[in-house]
């Protein structure tokens, strides 16, 4: 039971935190941006109908299909490798990625776009949200781990 309870609870808490931050952004940032560090970082509300960096605007159906495929693959991976202690960190990253996908999917389903609000003005970085952080940083760490830490044999059997 604990094997499924911890990941599901983590998924719910992470997704809930993402949704809470988006709710707060929609309610407190609608009037004007809040500059936290002048010329560096601000909270600026925007609604993104596209993917990362605003690509594929207005193609929500594509995001639904992509989210379903990726989430199915993550569930498959998680179940297949749930007894592999060496792969625990990968399973944790999968929870963060899933939470990010679900968080942005909730926005698309209920408001038709994704709520973004973090803006790094110093480098004019595209506006993003907590779910985007979950996805992007987890993917970066996952790629680094797969290239530098894990070997093919780590996926062949528990141990």
What kind of region is each of these model predictions?
Residues 1-159:
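Alpha-helical transmembrane bundles and membrane-interface segments of multipass inner-membrane proteins
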């Amino acid at each position: 039971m604990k094997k499924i309870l911890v990941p599901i609870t983590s998924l719910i808490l992470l997704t809930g935190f993402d949704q809470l931050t988006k709710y707060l952004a929609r309610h407190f940032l609608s009037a004007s941006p809040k500059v936290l560090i002048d010329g560096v970082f601000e909270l600026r509300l925007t609604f993104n109908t596209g993917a990362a960096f605003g690509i594929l605007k207005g193609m929500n159906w594509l995001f639904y299909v992509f989210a379903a495929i990726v989430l199915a693959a993550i569930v498959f991976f998680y179940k297949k490798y749930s007894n592999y202690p060496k792969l625990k960190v990968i399973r944790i990253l999968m929870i963060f990625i899933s939470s990010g996908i679900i968080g942005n999917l909730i926005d698309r389903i209920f408001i038709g776009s994704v709520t973004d609000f973090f803006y790094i003005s110093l480098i004019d970085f595209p506006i993003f949200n907590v779910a985007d952080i979950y996805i992007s940083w987890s993917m970066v760490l996952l790629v680094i781990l797969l290239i530098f830490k894990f070997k093919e044999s780590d996926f062949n059997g528990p141990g």
